[in-house]
Amino acid sequence: MTLNEAVERLRGDVDTNVDVYVERDTTPGVKKFTITRAFIRPPAIDPPARVLAVPAGPGQAAAKIGYFHMQHFSANSAGDLSDALALFDREKVKGIIMDLRGNPGGLYEQAQKVSDAFIKAGTLVSMVGVGGAQRKDETATDSGHEPTVPLAVLVNQNSASASEIVAGAVKNLDRGVVIGEGTFGKGSVQVLFDIPSPIPFGDRSDDDKLGLKLTTAQYLTPGDLSIQGTGVIPDVETDPLLVQKEGERSWIRLQPSTHRRREADYEWHLEHPSARKGEKPMELVSYLLQPKPGDKAHKNRSGDEDDESVEDQDETGESDDDQNQKTDFLIDFARDLLAQAKSSRRRDLVMGSKAFLDKVRAAEDKKVSQALEKQGVDWSAGPTNGQDPQLQLTLQPTTADAKITAGTQAKLKGVVKNVGRVPAFRVRAVLDSDNPIFDENEMVFGKIAPGESKSYELVVKVPASSFTRTDQIKASLYTQRGVVKAAGTDLLVNIEGKDRPMFAYTYQTIDDQKGSNRDGQVQRGEQVRMLVTVKNIGKGKAMHTEAVLRNGNGQEGILISAGRFEAKELAASETKTFSFIYEVRPDFKGDEYALDLAVADTTLGESLTDKIKVKIAPAGPAPEALSGTATITRDDAPLREAAGDSSLVVGRAPKGTVFKTSGKLGAFTRVDVDASRSAYVATADIKAGGNVHGTLKPEWQVTPPLLSVIAPTVVVGDSVHIKGHASDDRLVRDVYVRVWNRNAKIPVKKAFYQPNRLAGDRTKMDFEADIPLWAGSNLVQVFARESNEVQSLQTVVVLKRAPDGSIVAQPSPADSPPASPPAKK
């Protein structure tokens, strides 16, 4: 059941009941909960608004600051804000913090009303069509009740759309200070047009609706400034730093990531000439991120659970139970900034807070120094002027062949030697690689005296899902004065990927549950089992296998009660059987239903999906009871799902195999294949008697093509030559190749297609092609298809280097890639 399907079943008329059955690991059986439906309006401000106390300090009286977190802009946002402002007015707060971090947006008119609540005059936002046509300005109205205290708006990369409208209005009308990260950058307007479908897609009238979402306009913030692609740049940018160590692994992040995902990072994003590209924040404050004890605060962009990048972390550091009183650096920082503010105007507020900002920077810098000192790094600061240091940097692997196996730890060693005459302070190296597991990792050396060398060993976890690839790692060297030129070498490392699993499966629908007549067919009102046996036909083991059965899209009347199973490892050639259970309701409409089956190794990312269609049979007689045994009298006798020559073949039995008999229907006899299932065999293919022995050979109904691809991992030139072979027990319909390069910021390119036109035998095909490449690492995906649903995939990562061995310059995203060769006939 998908989330949407669950929502559809939960929704209903107010004051009606819905039963929810919950299964827990800690409680045997299933527990029933009856819920009375009601009209639910999630609060826009959550947790509730509160007042933060600021104690008195040197030269500063005690103060109160109001705080609220606007989660989204919904129909009740303005109303919830009105209640919060009433609280702040009663408490006589000196400033207000509006937290829009993680707010994806929402209703345009609510964003306008929230902005209007703080701003007395001016254009809050403009909606402008193509070429400036159909312009609509939303202006502030002076209600006489707008708060006049200083205002701070907290934003991050996940503040989007309506959030950016509010932040842009506050900033550009000089009403308050914006603090945090640059926002997402979505300033476009989409309109959804309903289109009637020419063909039915489901059983309900709603299933036949199609929609076209068309971009028709854009939002402009005050001053006609577009946020599209650039977002709102904060007045005070805050950068979280990380210094952590667990065992031999450390996580150092002393500068912000360049890979924060925003609108401009998506292929084919829109741009506008009024967007302020290159705008910088007025101030920058870095702070040490301090996770709560026991929290896993590290995970890199590759998805490795053990390595979290700073930008992926929850800055609050609080659990859900603590949300009513949550706090973090940004909230504390904004609270103290507003408490000492002498003006509510944005520019005056920031310019008048220089001393406060310097104090915060010094305190956070001290925290970083102390954290690094615990790791044995001298992070003391040196003089700000004088002669620049001269340094040499060497990167080297800790293994002789620089080969790393996927799923293990990679160890890289950096050595910096001071070959100059002056000491170098706060020396660190930042790695640069197309592979996110290496990219932006930092090696920290600290103070290095003249003639001294210092080393740092970086340990990273290479995910088990990594493909075989060669990665080039470069490093930029920084000192207290910024980036420095340093003689050194780049490093090539080879990752050896694991052999991948591949899944085949056979299934059988068995009507032996509640309300079933055991004729092997599915009738309305029956509860049935779908027995799915999965075989790993690949070379490598599956590390964590999941099998999921879902209802067909928009389909009602099929209720799945057991639809998800897990298995840990599935070795090559090993099989595993899953027993799904579902019910066909008596009111099901139609003569056929569809089920979506997915089998996946969630660790390695290999999967198989298929759509299974099952016909509804008319009500018929139950099989006649029969006892005894039967011996198979022909070679590879087909055993079927039901009693009929056109029924699905679920397996074959060799001549001489003996089964126990349990029923008879027409010209077929039901035999017990094993303790968990039965099947039907033609009575003409058996004779009575015999001692039970032998077993069923499964009939694999879905086996994706076997695919082998040969390609180098490093090339010099504009393309890579690949060749391969695909084979299947039924059909290899075609082969196609896609290529993608993360840094090129272009859509995935379909670079090659070859249909199988072999005369006679279409169960195999050879192919070869020249695939275009871009600078750096290219993900080349080769697909071999049996059908639209059943296909196999092999991924090759190819590093494109310049003739001198360096990474060639990355072209502009607008540049065209090398032309792909024509498909081979």
Model segments located where?
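Boundary regions of SH3-family modules and the immediately adjacent low-complexity/disordered segments
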Residues: 615-624, 672-702
